[in-house]
Amino acid sequence: MDEEHLRTLIRTIVRETLNPNLVPIGVSNHHVHLTEEDFQKLFPGQKIEMLKKLRQHADFAAKQTVDLIGPKGTIEHVRLMGPYRSHSQVEIARSENFTLGIDAPIRMSGDLDGTPSIKVRSPYAEIEIQGVIVAKRHIHMSLEDAKRFGVKLGDSMQVEVDGDGGRKTIFDDVVARPREDFVLEMHIDTDEANAANVGLGNNSFGKVIIKKKN
């Protein structure tokens, strides 16, 4: 176990002891997941390189970035995420639909049927990917967390966030995503974070106020 994961474990134990309903918040900026095949098309002969580990132990931000090219505009220097995925996927904020000129739906990761396509450009090549979404807010959690909250995969939760400057916000329909290797963390995008005045650091928390909604 490396130092960062040890710190995460210590923070988790302390938090769950003091307030078991608190959930760390991770703010997801726009990013791209690629299959190994699509990565090789964009970065021939290269390997995806780790820039920074993320809270979910298998995931990392890569050194490589790409540009997203839509019918109306371009978003440059969009970070790739590793490891490789079985399907390529682009995640943006809702407001970035207007920049790009597309209409990406709010979906869970991997739910790509009927999603728009977009051109993805690297310094070496350009490809078109079908699979642009606005990620639906969700909570990664271990199986033990799910048992503690009384939820299962796909259940809807409600989380209260005390943003800076008195911007208390209640996020409804937060999807539970339990898995054995997941670490407790709520994911929201930059639009949602801005609305609640939540920072991009690792010190923001939400409080689960309704553990399960039918």
Curated annotation (Swiss-Prot):
Acyltransferase keyword on record:
yes
Location(s), subcellular: Bacterial microcompartment
Output one GO MF annotation: metal ion binding
This enzyme's EC code(s): 2.3.1.222
Question: Which amino acid positions bind Zn(2+) 1, per UniProt?
Answer: 31, 33, 91
Say yes or no: keyword Zinc present. yes
GO-annotated biological processes: propanediol catabolic process
Q: Which UniProt keywords apply?
A: Acyltransferase, Bacterial microcompartment, Metal-binding, Transferase, Zinc
Q: Per UniProt, where does phosphate bind?
A: 85
Q: Which InterPro entries match?
A: PTAC (IPR008300)
Its UniProt pathway annotation is: Polyol metabolism; 1,2-propanediol degradation
Q: Provide the residue positions that the database annotates as binding CoA.
A: 27-29, 72, 79, 98, 194
Which GO cellular component terms are attached? Answer: bacterial microcompartment
Q: What class of enzyme is it?
A: transferase
Q: Where does Zn(2+) 2 bind?
A: 138, 140, 187
Q: Which cofactor does it need?
A: Zn(2+)
* Reactions performed catalytically: propanoyl-CoA + phosphate = propanoyl phosphate + CoA
The cofactor note reads: There are 2 Zn(2+) ions per monomer; Zn(2+) and CoA bind inbetween the 2 domains in each monomer.
The similarity comment for this entry is: Belongs to the PduL family.
Q: What does this protein do?
A: Involved in 1,2-propanediol (1,2-PD) utilization within the bacterial microcompartment (BMC) dedicated to 1,2-PD degradation by catalyzing the conversion of propanoyl-CoA to propanoyl-phosphate.
Reproduce the free-text note on domains from the UniProt record. Formed by 2 beta-barrels, each is capped on both ends by short alpha-helices.
Q: Under what name is this protein listed?
A: Phosphate propanoyltransferase
Organism (species)? Limosilactobacillus reuteri (strain DSM 20016)
